[in-house]
Amino acid sequence: MEHLISLFVRSIFVDNMIFAFFLGMCSYLAVSKNVKTAVGLGIAVTFVLVVTLPVNYFLQTKVLAANAIIEGVDLSFLSFILFIAVIAGIVQLVEMVVERFSPSLYASLGIFLPLIAVNCAIMGASLFMQQRINVGESDPKYIGDVWDAISYALGSGIGWLLAIVGLAAIREKMAYSDVPDALKGLGITFITVGLMAMAFMCFSGLNI
């Protein structure tokens, strides 16, 4: 249980997908103009992470790993293709659910909802998980079973959600601020993201 909590907290604050690895920046910048829309996308990304990582963990350990199916056969070269296929399938399911039950959110997210399928934060989480399976049990980042994968996925999703909602809240306030003309738009947004990332750097020294 302690290891699960450690993985969860680390993935939110220490190994935040946005502020530590800058993954998923395209949709992060494009959909962070409104808090409501940002919350919707953040929840969708979190859901996709929580569903895809356990599936990809199973594929990695039971199918792709060396000697997993047949002695002497290593299918790890197929990991990119299979991971992307799983992510795309789950995203398609999420898109259909959102369109059915929340048409306004579906319209607000626009093209960025199906683009979750190529959101590098989700693919990055699967690849980080793939690496962490092999680091050894003594490493705090170790992912040794499906529950570790779920904990890491949930933390990564919540970390991404916090990042996009935080930026959206700031950008809503900045819309009424006297921003210099040269910095309006993405200029002041990049500065804001940089300051937020620097703030999250204070967590990097935590020994969790």
Please state what every model-predicted region is.
Residues 6-19, 73-87, 150-163:
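Structural signature of hydrophobic alpha-helical transmembrane segments
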Residues 23-27, 45-51, 84-93, 118-125, ...:
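Hydrophobic core segments of alpha-helical transmembrane domains in multi-pass membrane transport
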Residues 23-37, 91-105, 167-178:
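C-terminal ends of transmembrane helices
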Residues 37-47, 78-83, 105-116, 182-188:
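Cytoplasmic-side transmembrane-helix entry/capping segments in multi-pass membrane proteins
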Residues 172-190:
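Interfacial loop-to-transmembrane junctions
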